[in-house]
Design a protein with these regions (language model features):
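Glycine-rich phosphate-binding P-loop
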Residues: 63-81
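Pre-Walker A adenine-sensing motif
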Residues: 44-54
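NTP-dependent small-molecule kinase module
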Residues: 211-214, 218-274
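Pre-Walker A (Motif I) flank of P-loop NTPase domains
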Residues: 56-63, 117-118, 225-226
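A glycine- and Lys/Arg-enriched "phosphate-lid" helix/loop adjacent to the NTP-binding pocket
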Residues: 133-151, 159-211, 258-265, 272
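Conserved nucleotide-sensing/catalytic segment adjacent to the nucleotide-binding pocket
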Residues: 23-37, 89-147
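Switch/connector loops and helix/strand junctions flanking conserved nucleotide-binding motifs
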Residues: 73, 100-103, 129-135, 161, ...
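Charged, amphipathic alpha-helical linker segments immediately N-terminal to NTP-binding catalytic cores
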Residues: 1-41
């Protein structure tokens, strides 16, 4: 899964088919079944990681989700991590920065939401907004944005050195698929609340966003924190693929149940005597 989706030298976002399902044979029904099958293992690995931290473990996982609007970032959190114990999940959605946040460097608002040891953190949007929308809409000067690519790479290298495994995912949808999803939000009263008129404004800059993503992905995909581009026209596939990336990362970490720091047999005897 990693190698199929990883951003590597020569990567071209324009060449990625957003309706493809690399690494999976089957359709929506089979994808849902595979997702359900992986949920149990993911939940157990997450709980082991959390338990490990209660006994001095320092490791954590950070899942960074970036995408155009309607690509399904929220659905990833619900469907991929929905079976995991919520006490070990830290999810945060970054909105437009506040006046206070704008008064500091762009990573200032990110650091408080980094996952603590034992947690899986999820960023719905992230520090990458400062080289994506800022580039497209001219919110920062070109030389400032250029400097940020290096700052981001250093920041992520620092996190990895401190014990955080970073999984950066771009959910890649087509302009036509986004249009269909926006139309669905308008057609269905139960989805009207999800619609934001500003999403149509951003569609006018589609090509510029694709260019900004191409630059950001290639400039900041490093051995420490590689990017993965997940075709997301099919929501079921995107969820399956992200679950696979998380499972691969957690299997590599291989967290273990902590050994009891007390005499188990003696405690059984004490309990039996009560």
């Amino acid at each position: 899964m990693h190698e199929l989706l990883r951003v590597s030298p020569g990567f071209s976002l324009a060449s990625i088919d957003s309706s493809a399902t690399p690494g999976f044979v089957g359709g929506k029904k089979e994808g849902a079944a595979s997702l359900a099958a992986g949920a149990t293992e993911l939940a157990e690995l997450q709980e082991k990681l959390f338990a490990e931290s209660r006994f001095g473990g320092t490791r954590s996982v950070l899942l960074v989700l970036q995408a155009m609007d309607t690509a399904g970032k929220g659905g990833i959190v619900d469907h991929v991590l929905g079976e995991a114990n919520p006490q070990g999940i830290q999810a945060f959605s970054f909105k437009a920065p506040t006046e206070e946040e704008r008064a500091h460097d762009f990573l200032w608002r990110i650091r408080p939401h980094l996952p603590q040891p034992g947690y899986i953190g999820v960023f719905d949007r992230s520090h990458y907004e400062d080289v994506l929308i800022h580039r497209v809409r001219g919110f920062s000067a070109p030389e400032v944005i250029e400097e940020r690519y290096g700052i981001i790479a250093d920041f992520e290298r620092e996190l990895v050195a401190a014990g955080t495994t970073i999984i950066k995912v771009m959910l890649h949808i087509s302009a036509d698929e986004q249009k269909a999803r926006l139309r669905e939000r308008l057609d269905r009263p139960d989805k009207n609340w999800k619609y934001n008129p500003g999403d149509v404004d951003e569609r006018q800059h589609w090509d510029a966003y694709q260019e900004a993503y191409q630059i950001a992905l290639t400039r900041t995909s490093t051995p420490d924190a590689p990017w993965y581009v997940v075709p997301a026209d099919h929501k079921w596939y995107a969820r399956w693929a992200v679950q696979g990336l998380l499972l691969d990362a957690l299997r590599t970490l291989d967290p273990q149940w902590p050994a009891a720091d007390y005499d188990v047999d003696a405690e059984k005897e004490r309990l039996a005597a009560t």
